[in-house]
Structure formats: C-alpha cells, structure tokens
C-alpha cells in the first residue's frame, strides 16, 4: 500500500528565466546554500518558524537534496523520452524527528559532499544541451527544461528559512 499526503501546490505560475548559463545555476545555488549552512554549527536545537513551517538545519538540507534529486530525475526522464514520476512527498510540510538532530561538522561535510555532487550532475547534464532542447515545451502545462532549472536554482529558499545563525 502506498500512502502520501494529498496536498497540491501547483499555482500554475512559470518561473522567471534570464540569460544566465543554465549549467552554472545549480552549482551557484549549492555554493550559496553551503555558505549559509556553514553558520549552522552549534545550532541550539530549536526550530525556526518561517513561512508557515518549522525549519531546522537538517530539514533545510533534506529539502535542498530532495528538490535537486526530484528535478534531476524529471529532466533525465524527459530527455530520455520517458514519462516523469510524480512526486507525492511533501517534505516541506513535515518536520521529522530526524530533522531535530544536532547539526555537526560531520553533517556539514556530508551535505557538502552530497550537494556538490548533485550540482556537478546538473552542470554535466545541462552543459551541452542546445537552446532548442532547453526551451522545448511538450505541452502548454509543462515547464521547459530551462524553466525547471531556474525554478530549482531557488533551493536557496530552504537555507534562507533557517538563515545565517553565526558569523562565518
């Protein structure tokens, strides 16, 4: 049996795009996330309440990794001509017990390793794609790959929900 929350969050608004190289958007966003995460060592264990949710360092990094992975699989499926698999997990809406764990140097090191490797996958995959592929719209309801990448580059939102906790 599969169970999941049935919340939907499709506002139908396409993300803004600009002329930045899509291959650099995710690595730049990950660098910004990790810069903020570096200030979370010594977090006091209390969740930060922002934008209708409880946020912790672990939850923010979980959401960044989930978001990067979800959309990377979407892009890969589309480029392979395969149907995408809808995401029924609404991880932003829940805070797990694991999200309340202490945030240590080891956690930052793990996040750095994981997120920089995901960013490298985006850079490698997107770097050689022609504009025609990046801007193809399979149907009116589907975002272009360029729009997806610009959307994903906003993963800095999750780190911003925790914010900078100490001086770097």
Where would I find each of the regions flagged by the language model?
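Aromatic-glycine hotspot motif
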Residues: 1-168
């Amino acid at each position: 049996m599969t169970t999941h929350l049935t919340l939907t969050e499709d506002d139908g608004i396409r993300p803004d795009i600009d002329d930045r190289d899509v291959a650099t958007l995710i690595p730049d966003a990950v660098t910004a996330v990790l810069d903020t995460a570096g200030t979370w060592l010594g977090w006091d264990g209390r969740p930060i309440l922002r934008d209708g949710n409880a946020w912790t360092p672990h939850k923010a990094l979980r959401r960044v990794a989930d978001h990067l992975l979800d959309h990377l699989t979407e892009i890969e499926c589309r480029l392979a001509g395969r149907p995408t698999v809808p995401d029924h997990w609404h991880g932003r809406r829940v805070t797990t017990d694991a999200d309340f764990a202490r945030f240590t140097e080891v956690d930052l090191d793990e996040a750095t390793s994981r997120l920089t490797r995901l960013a490298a996958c985006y850079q490698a995959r997107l770097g050689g794609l022609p504009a025609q592929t990046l801007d193809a719209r399979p149907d009116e309801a589907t975002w272009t790959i360029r729009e997806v990448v610009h959307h994903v580059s906003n993963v800095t939102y999750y780190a911003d929900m925790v914010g900078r906790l100490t001086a770097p």
